Amino acid sequence: VQNQGFISGWFYAPNSANSGSPAERDALIKDSDNIRAWLAGGLAGYRFQTAEGNVVTGANIDYRGQPSAYTADPQEAINYASKHDNETIWDISQYKHATGTALAERVRADNVATSVIMLAQGIPFIHAGTELLRSKSMDRNSYASGDWYNEIDWTGATSKWNKGLPRPAD
């Protein structure tokens, strides 16, 4: 699904799946409460002011029908934006950005995603090569794809973005 999120232009630079409507703006503002809860290490008891001005704990913030924050200690939270399976954060953000989004803005958005993970309380989990804007060319199951999609050029001289079609879906 091409619905945008926090780093990919939701509301402020809509793609073909989003409209930049007032309802999307309100949803993004409400979703910022989740981001605040996650930056605090997912602490269930952490008190903060929501976008609506209410003072709540992280456990009172809804994330898809469950509490956004649930930990007693930030060390209980693993923070990540992408992992070893499925697309990299670079791949998925390329898919979700509006077509005309400049490369420099896409890179900044990817850096924001990585920065949130690194600066939030908790344990950061960084997918190998994320700092190099690593791509697996949208391969959702690269385990069976071999080195073509899984190798990392640590020099940063090459990229796998858009370098061939991913395997057929499982």
Across the structure, where does each feature detected by a protein language model lie?
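Alpha-amylase-like alpha-glycosidases and glucanotransferases acting on alpha-linked glucans and related
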Residues: 1-102, 168-170
